[in-house]
Amino acid sequence: MSEPLLEVRGLSSGYGESRVLDDISFSMGVEAVGIIGRNGMGKTTLCDTLMGLVRATSGEVLLHGQRIEGRTPEKVARSGISYVPQGRRLFASLSVDEHLRMLAKGTRGKRWTPDAVYELFPRLAQRRSSGGADLSGGEQQMLAVGRTLLLNGSLVLMDEPSEGLAPTIVDVLVEAVHRLVAEGTAVLVVEQKLLAATAMAERQLVMVSGRIQAETTATQLRADPELQRRYLGVGSAVETGEQPTAAPAKGRHA
């Protein structure tokens, strides 16, 4: 059996005296894996802990068999994890092309270059001279993903990539995730929208109150209203074609 690309063992973390993550364990290879859960269940804290932005209080994180918990965010990124956080975090005055060229140094001969990003997202190529503030929400998210790809990491971590986006733009991101995996890049997707999460990844880890409560498949999750209600606080809106979103929980961290 081959070694997992990412392995998380008994990971806990929090803020001050408040524990948010509680004994998280999972592993993944070169695949797309979804972390789905209601708002406030600790999903963003998991992302930030994996990236070294929040200190782990216990447990281990291994990437390619090497422990990376305790490293700075810069060292985690150099180890091979690329992060697309919530909020997109673009520069309003820089053009699309300037955003990409800023990170293009050293990409010659690697899989992801600015031209490869434009090929993945043709809409960005059409808007390459537009400033970050002039882009639509969907275009900003494409740019945020494309900019991250230029780091040429072995694992891309996406936090709520479908947030605020029209279904047609979500479809573009779904296609991008599938292509990344097909070309050898692992993707860990954190989502609370059921349809987006299950379209991006067949394997789903359900997060409740800072713990991985269940592992299931996208197929099973879409087809099981009881599972949706129990873990996500939603009904069977998926049957009507609506975009079910996990109900928020009070007093918890995202």
What are the language-model segments listed below?
Residues 36-38:
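The feature captures the beta-strand-to-loop junction immediately N-terminal to the Walker
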Residues 131-135, 139:
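Conserved ABC ATPase signature
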Residues 156-160:
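Catalytic Walker B motif of ABC-type/P-loop ATPase nucleotide-binding domains
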Residues 148-149:
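ABC ATPase C-loop
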Residues 6, 20-21:
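Conserved structural motif at the start of ABC-family nucleotide-binding domains
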Residues 51:
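Helix-to-loop junction immediately C-terminal to a conserved catalytic motif
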